[in-house]
Each structure stands twice: as C-alpha cells, then as structure tokens.
Amino acid sequence: MKVLILIIASVLLIGVECKDGFPVDSEGCILLPCATRAYCSVNCKFMKGSGGSCDTLACHCKGLPEDAKVQDKPTNKCGRK
C-alpha cells in the first residue's frame, strides 16, 4: 500500500511538460495551414501532440513534445530572425 502511494505521489510531482503552439519548420514558417478542425487534430497527433484546432488560419497544436519547434503567435516569420 505504501508503495502504491509513493508511485502516485511521484507521478503527480514529476508531471509531464508539453508545448502548445503553432508548429514551424527550420526556417520559422508555419507548417500546417488550417483546413478544418479535424485536419488540424489529426496532423497535430501525427506530430506526437494531444490534438489541435484551427486558430487564425493556422493549426494550433496542444501537448507537443518539448523538442518541437513552435511559435506562440501565428505570425509567419519564414526565415527572418
């Protein structure tokens, strides 16, 4: 019983950090234009996210891995710093 409580407490304390945002390529260009909510959700899940939705003509993904490249806002810099 003590072991079970220890495991549950450990899981709650460790947590899992995830990113939310607009996925971008190496040039900083937004990857997924928004077609439908279902399209965004499927593509965000393909990128190992928990899901996605349409937001300002771009897909906004939720629950992406920490190493995913994202922008917080849907401004498309595309190669500009």
UniProtKB/Swiss-Prot annotation:
Q: What does this protein do?
A: Beta toxins bind voltage-independently at site-4 of sodium channels (Nav) and shift the voltage of activation toward more negative potentials thereby affecting sodium channel activation and promoting spontaneous and repetitive firing.
Q: Where is the signal peptide?
A: 1-18
Organs and tissues of expression: Expressed by the venom gland.
Q: Which residues carry this modification: Cysteine amide?
A: C78
Regarding domains, what does the record say?
A: Has the structural arrangement of an alpha-helix connected to antiparallel beta-sheets by disulfide bonds (CS-alpha/beta).
Q: Family assignment?
A: Belongs to the long (4 C-C) scorpion toxin superfamily. Sodium channel inhibitor family. Beta subfamily.
PROSITE patterns recorded for this chain?
LCN_CSAB
- The protein here is known as Beta-toxin Ct13
Q: Which organism is it from?
A: Centruroides tecomanus
Question: Which GO cellular component does the record give, naming just one?
Answer: extracellular region
Q: Which residues form the LCN-type CS-alpha/beta domain?
A: 19-78
Q: List the disulfide bonds.
A: C29-C78, C34-C54, C40-C59, C44-C61
Which compartment or compartments is the protein found in?
Answer: Secreted
Q: Which UniProt keywords apply?
A: Amidation, Disulfide bond, Ion channel impairing toxin, Neurotoxin, Secreted, Signal, Toxin, Voltage-gated sodium channel impairing toxin
One term of GO molecular function: toxin activity
